[in-house]
């Protein structure tokens, strides 16, 4: 059941209107869908995904990749994590259920899902690099739990 619901939302997101060109370019919603497909892994349990995965990295902007690499170097020097959760699953222990991905204008997409009874909304902001949409920031949470990947990984944190 879980996998069939995932497949339904993937199909719905792929059919969503977006800023994709006729040349087969992926819209922000389609890029977001592709990231969650990679994260789901072969079992659909979201236990294998991470931002370092070479299949995910290709969807990140050059600027975001550079910022993540710089954060990793600072993290190693400090011998402690700066980014201590996974932004795609908005967790330390991934549990993604009832995933729905939607376009948010032409330059963003949101992934809405549940971890048990907890609803998560993760927003992906995109930039164009050449003719391709790339993820340039990820944010989520609300209230005191609100977070922004760029804010977390920027120099001066930790």
Regions found by a protein language model. Give the residues of each.
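Bacterial N-terminal signal peptides that target proteins for export
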Residues: 1-7
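N-terminal signal peptide c-region/cleavage motif recognized by signal peptidases
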Residues: 13-19
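Surface-exposed, charged secondary-structure patches
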Residues: 23, 57-118
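Short, aromatic-enriched amphipathic alpha-helices that serve as compact interaction elements
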Residues: 26-44
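Stable alpha-helical elements in mature extracytoplasmic
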Residues: 27-32, 52, 56, 60
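Surface-exposed patches in mature extracellular/periplasmic domains of secreted proteins
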Residues: 43-55
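Low-complexity, intrinsically disordered terminal/linker segments enriched in charged
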Residues: 102-107, 112-121, 129, 137-158
């Amino acid at each position: 059941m879980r996998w069939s619901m995932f497949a339904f939302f993937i199909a719905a997101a792929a059919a969503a209107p977006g800023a994709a060109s006729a040349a087969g370019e992926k819209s922000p919603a389609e890029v977001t869908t592709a990231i969650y497909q990679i994260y789901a892994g072969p079992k659909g349990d979201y236990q294998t995904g991470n931002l370092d995965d070479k299949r995910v990295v290709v969807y990140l902007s050059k600027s975001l990749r550079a910022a993540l690499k710089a954060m990793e170097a600072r993290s190693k020097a400090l011998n402690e994590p700066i980014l201590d959760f996974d932004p795609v699953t908005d967790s330390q222990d991934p549990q993604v259920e009832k995933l729905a991905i939607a376009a948010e204008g032409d330059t963003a997409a949101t992934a809405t899902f549940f971890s048990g009874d907890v609803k998560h909304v993760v927003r992906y902001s995109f930039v164009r690099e050449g003719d391709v949409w790339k993820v340039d920031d990820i944010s989520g949470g609300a209230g005191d739990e609100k977070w922004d990947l760029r804010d977390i990984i920027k120099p001066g944190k930790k």
